[in-house]
Amino acid sequence: MIMPFHLAGMSLPISPKLPGLLRSVVREQRLDLNNLSTLTFNFRSPDYSAETGGVHPVELRLIRGLHGWVFDYITDFSYQGLGQDAELCKELDFNLSCDEHYLQGWGPLPGVEARELFALWQSNFISYAQLGYFTVTVSGE
């Protein structure tokens, strides 16, 4: 199964390892991509909780374009609040399709800051995934 990605013109620096990771997930889950136009990947660490912290959950969405799969958004979630009032909220939101990026507590991020933060986040995320911290579910439409 071939899963081409179209990365030209992306506002953030996508490492070749990230599409490789997503291809591996699709292959492992034996997904049939023929009739799908979107894929949503949910990466969850079973040990992550409001009390103990841990590796944040991540949602990543791809859209099928004319020249391959394109990144729509990548969102990193974290628990905010204390005790029973803690709720899972967006901490980092990289909207690649519209070049708008957000960090909780800071608000919208200018391009240079977004690129630097994304490069660091992406490196950590790929490392955590390769180390097996996540269970992954994929849904498609």
Each model region followed by its residue ranges:
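Short non-domain terminal segments
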Residues: 3, 39-41, 69, 75, ...
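Generic secondary-structure transition motif, activating predominantly at the C-termini of alpha-helices
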Residues: 22, 26-30, 34, 78, ...
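Amphipathic, interaction-prone secondary-structure segments
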Residues: 30-69
